[in-house]
Amino acid sequence: MSKTVVLAEKPSVGRDLARVLKCHKKGNGYLEGDQYIVTWALGHLVTLADPEGYGKEFQSWRLEDLPIIPEPLKLVVIKKTGKQFNAVKSQLTRKDVNQIVIATDAGREGELVARWIIEKANVRKPIKRLWISSVTDKAIKEGFQKLRSGKEYENLYHSAVARAEADWIVGINATRALTTKFNAQLSCGRVQTPTLAMIAKREADIQAFTPVPYYGIRAAVDGMTLTWQDKKSKQTRTFNQDVTSRLLKNLQGKQAVVAELKKTAKKSFAPALYDLTELQRDAHKRFGFSAKETLSVLQKLYEQHKLVTYPRTDSRFLSSDIVPTLKDRLEGMEVKPYAQYVSQIKKRGIKSHKGYVNDAKVSDHHAIIPTEEPLVLSSLSDKERKLYDLIAKRFLAVLMPAFEYEETKVIAEIGGETFTAKGKTVQSQGWKAVYDMAEEDDEQEDDRDQTLPALQKGDTLAVRTLTETSGQTKPPARFNEGTLLSAMENPSAFMQGEEKGLVKTLGETGGLGTVATRADIIEKLFNSFLIEKKGQDIFITSKGKQLLQLVPEDLKSPALTAEWEQKLSAIAAGKLKSAVFIKDMKAYAHQTVKEIKNSSQTFRHDNITGTACPECGKMMLKVNGKRGTMLVCQDRECGSRKTIARKTNARCPNCHKRMELRGQGEGQTFACVCGHREKLSVFEKRKNKDKARATKRDVSSYMKKQNKDEPINNALAEQLKKLGLDK
């Protein structure tokens, strides 16, 4: 009997498909049933070959070899997942298999994952496509009843290949040209370089900003504070201090008369469910998690604990087929501290509405929500628990009723001038009951509501004090990882002067990068020492500034990505041949390399040290990495690097913040931002005192984490080994 191979993108999805398709026989990287064989990728198993794959002459980076444009580009199996590729290939090539169902993610990249595997395996069998937005049993069953011909998605595949090949052709050649021309480790690309340019633009705006003082007036009356409002502009501040000085003088001794009372019943609905970017923003804001860290923790909640749905989603809505599963999901999380809210929702009944259910706004995957898996909070690490809490509370909030309140606005007059105050009376906490109010209170001080006394129109109030308030306009805030993610998702503010069509295209296609790649892009900018962190703020380095002066202008603008997306969409729609687009990209690569070769600019290492590289003898560069300070060889091919100061997991005995380990050998010293300094030898003695309280498991776990965080030159881990606490 002939069988059908179903190719999923990940093992977890493969297991879901296998369960529905009754494939229970376990094999090496697959599950088999009477009719179907379900196997899976691990994301991409196949990729485009590096330049070295086209000949030994490309192992060395030389300007005269550029541009490198192989015909055609070759596919290679990714080494670290080669075992799974072979497992998939063995199923695809079975003689009893006469059909393939592509069940990877419903999108451009999902199509590429599957088709490249099939192409590299050299399989020529009929293809069907499973195109579903969620992996519930119902969705899978309906999807298999409506399988579509693979030919319908060939244009989508062509657009995916075009995107990948264009990124290779432009990225490889521009990076090698910059690195060899300027003898510095420089990299660029159509996503990372515009992202770097946005950081530089923000820094330039901050440096060019001139603060302007402003002034206002507050009047303290019985039971409340009134704020002066300009009658014409309706603003509560003026940039002319003469205005407030004159008013303070003229209004002395005057009473306030209530001219108007406006009472309005209002409702506030819960914020939308999380997509990956919004969750990364919130996790950074609440807990200081990096974008990469959030994705890593989220992946564990999804794959290991099975407590949340697919992480790499760009949708903040659910599809209608998920609604019948909501009760089971609620029951799975019916433990403290969520049980009381689950009980309220079940008692009230689950009411779906367009605030969180919208099929039109779900593409590949729906929003991140809890699964029906029973929640055991004690099995989660601190970070996992924090992230789950964000997801769980947002999920509960959208199922709760609206927050209802009555807003009262008081308009009073003092000596003919208008003063206002706002108050709020809560009628029903609704969804806000789920949250600690301190979490949600992001309002500016000027806008905060007061508890107002009982008032009537015409009431006269004694003015106790009149006070001038003042402040200064503030420059734009520097990016942190959360706000940078937002800018990447919506870069329109950095596209002034570009065609409206390009701005619109980027808005429709999700901005720079994807939800799955943005964290890696930011991490790459850190690891390339193009940006650095000071506290939570991101600064562009001297190297980053110089790179932007050296790269062609096109590569610095988000417009390049927008132009590509327009053409890739046309390829997917069958309106443009991919060969035409690739021909343009090859011409663009030639132009870019030529521009870099002919550049008269130079790159200056302003961070060069007097320390010679132990490998090649060239002077090393001092760079601030994401986790500490390093010495890096200026020769890219040497690649030697050494950590000289780094953030550790050792806590300051005074303020309990993480300390930095500085220096080399016996002179190594821990330093904390609070000013505490502690020699490594003193640290060892303190650890010895705690030895009786530290279990082998504690120390082993600690050292594993240290090695995972930063395996290079980890002096702290070495010293812990010497203490023998892990024996």
Swiss-Prot record:
Top-level taxonomic group: Bacteria
Class of enzymatic activity (EC top level): isomerase
Marked site (Interaction with DNA) residue numbers: 61, 168, 176, 312
Every Toprim domain range: 3-136
Biased composition (Basic and acidic residues): 685-699
Active-site residues annotated for this sequence: 310 (o-(5'-phospho-dna)-tyrosine intermediate)
Keywords from the UniProt entry: DNA-binding, Isomerase, Magnesium, Metal-binding, Topoisomerase
Residues that hold Mg(2+) according to the record: 9, 105
Start and end residues of each Topo IA-type catalytic domain: 153-593
The EC number(s) this enzyme carries: 5.6.2.1
Region (Interaction with DNA): 187-192
Region of interest (Disordered), residue spans: 685-714
Catalytic reaction list: ATP-independent breakage of single-stranded DNA, followed by passage and rejoining
GO molecular function: DNA binding; DNA topoisomerase type I (single strand cut, ATP-independent) activity; magnesium ion binding
GO terms under cellular component: cytoplasmic replication fork
Cofactor(s) of this protein: Mg(2+)
GO biological process: one example: DNA repair
SMART domains: TOP1Ac, TOP1Bc, TOPRIM
CDD domains: TOP1Ac, TOPRIM_TopoIA_TopoIII
Family to which this protein belongs: Belongs to the type IA topoisomerase family.
Function summary: Releases the supercoiling and torsional tension of DNA, which is introduced during the DNA replication and transcription, by transiently cleaving and rejoining one strand of the DNA duplex. Introduces a single-strand break via transesterification at a target site in duplex DNA. The scissile phosphodiester is attacked by the catalytic tyrosine of the enzyme, resulting in the formation of a DNA-(5'-phosphotyrosyl)-enzyme intermediate and the expulsion of a 3'-OH DNA strand. The free DNA strand then undergoes passage around the unbroken strand, thus removing DNA supercoils.
Name the record gives this protein: DNA topoisomerase 3
Organism: Bacillus subtilis (strain 168)
Lineage, opening ranks: Bacteria, Bacillati, Bacillota, Bacilli, Bacillales
